Amino acid sequence: MGRRGVTVWFTGLSGAGKTTLSCGVAQQLQALGLPVEVLDGDLVRQHLSKELGFSRADRDENVRRIGFVAEMLTRHGVIVLVSAISPYRATRQEVRQQIGNFIEVFVDAPLEVCEQRDVKGLYRKARAGLIRHFTGIDDPYEPPEYPEVVCKTAEQSISECIDLVMQSLRSHGYLQ
């Protein structure tokens, strides 16, 4: 029997640190010789969800597509690291149920901190009304109620957050 795969789903506002954290965890897992794939929400949107906008229905569909790919990889023993805002609790719960082996990581940073980190200028554009349906500004973000891991990236270092995720993978039996 092969190794058990798992999906680690990093959720949080734009600029909270999801991509940085998932890439850091990926490096640690690769150093252990483990099969790992990172599914970054921005890249998935560019390649698998180009036609989708940012309505609630389109965001939900994008998350479902990410979940579909993650589930296939997880089933084949891969550790899948998903980095996606995925703002709606019900849709995250839906993909959790679909995938089964699932660890939710809430990458928690205050809106003000996310705006300060905004290298793409998206928050500024959203506040100016140039981008509509922007999560945290004119569209809601529903924080997880019971995530397995909470990383407060305004207070904790990235290495501390990586350690929390690695500890969760160990405690749930996905790593030795």
Swiss-Prot record:
Keyword Repressor applies: no
GO biological process: hydrogen sulfide biosynthetic process; sulfate assimilation via adenylyl sulfate reduction; sulfate assimilation, phosphoadenylyl sulfate reduction by phosphoadenylyl-sulfate reductase (thioredoxin)
EC number: 2.7.1.25
Family label: Belongs to the APS kinase family.
Organism field: Synechococcus sp. (strain JA-3-3Ab)
Superkingdom: Bacteria
GO cellular component annotations of the record: cytoplasm
Protein name per its UniProtKB record: Adenylyl-sulfate kinase
Annotated residues for binding of ATP: 12-19
